[in-house]
Amino acid sequence: MTVVSAFLVPGTPLPQLKPEVPSWGQLAAATERAGKALAASRPDVVLVYSTQWLAVLDQQWLTRPRSEGVHVDENWYEFGDLAYDIRADTALAEACVTSSPLHGVHARGVNYDGFPIDTGTITACTLMGIGTDAFPLVVGSNNLYHSGEITEKLAALAVDCAKDQNKRVAVVGVGGLSGSLFREEIDPREDRIANEEDDKWNRRVLKLIEAGDVSALREAMPVYAKEARVDMGFKHLHWILGALKGKFSGANVLGYGPSYGSGAAVIEFRL
């Protein structure tokens, strides 16, 4: 089996930066738990897709062996900085660059000092303990012009490239659920999902994921994305579906809660 584990985790930095806030701390603990499950699956590489690595020209793959620095989130800068030191599997990333045009997608590698690693990738790496020598990454960008279908195709080709290199793969989709944020300042201890309808939609979709009902999930996703203004149309879930060839038996929701009004969940998929 090439894919040995799969996870969906939030891209918000709030659980990492302010774990003392109860609801955010629960998400941080859940993400750390997901990281332990990932490590237990013994992958050779982790395929990561973050909705916050935005691209408009080509599909980008991170081909720099080591990326390090300090990142300041453009929205949550008042809560602190995000230091990172991330290792990449360059052989597999280069294979993804080469394979992408064969699937109708223009692609290029990104390898230069100071490239701005996004918040979601950094947070996932920090809390899950990935992007290390033991668990190097292959990171694909979120091209704003790519549909969910293309995103699935990219994840599938990355898995195929890993199979060609005889590598065990963990898959991580980084992003949120419902997208309504509070526009006014709130007490973080009183954070909640912004409205009841968003919460209902989140819980409905999480139940479908838990049940492994992929057919019903695919039917619900476009409506959910529109009605609840889901983070980037739920392309991070499309990434997971593509890597899993559209099949999984169920999932465990390790955590669900608010991130300044928006929805966030930590999910471990059963393969």
UniProtKB/Swiss-Prot annotation:
Keywords for the protein's UniProt record, in alphabetical order: Aromatic hydrocarbons catabolism, Plasmid
Functional pathway: Xenobiotic degradation; nitrobenzene degradation; Xenobiotic degradation; 4-chloronitrobenzene degradation
Keyword Iron applies: no
MF annotations from Gene Ontology: ferrous iron binding; oxidoreductase activity, acting on single donors with incorporation of molecular oxygen, incorporation of two atoms of oxygen
Pfam family of the protein (one): LigB
Domain of life: Bacteria
GO biological process per UniProt: catabolic process
Summary of the function given for this chain in its UniProt record: Component of the 2-aminophenol 1,6-dioxygenase (APD) complex that catalyzes the ring fission of 2-aminophenol to produce 2-aminomuconic semialdehyde. CnbCa may have a role in the stability of the complex. The complex is also active on other substrates such as 2-amino-5-chlorophenol (68% activity), protocatechuate (33% activity) and catechol (5% activity).
Remarks, miscellaneous: Not active on 4-methylcatechol, 4-chlorocatechol, 2,4-dihydroxybenzoate, o-nitrophenol, p-nitrophenol or 4-nitrocatechol.
Recorded family membership: Belongs to the LigB/MhpB extradiol dioxygenase family.
Quaternary structure and interacting proteins, as annotated: The APD complex is a heterotetramer of 2 alpha (CnbCa) and 2 beta (CnbCb) subunits.
Protein name: 2-aminophenol 1,6-dioxygenase subunit alpha
Organism for this UniProt entry: Comamonas testosteroni (Pseudomonas testosteroni)
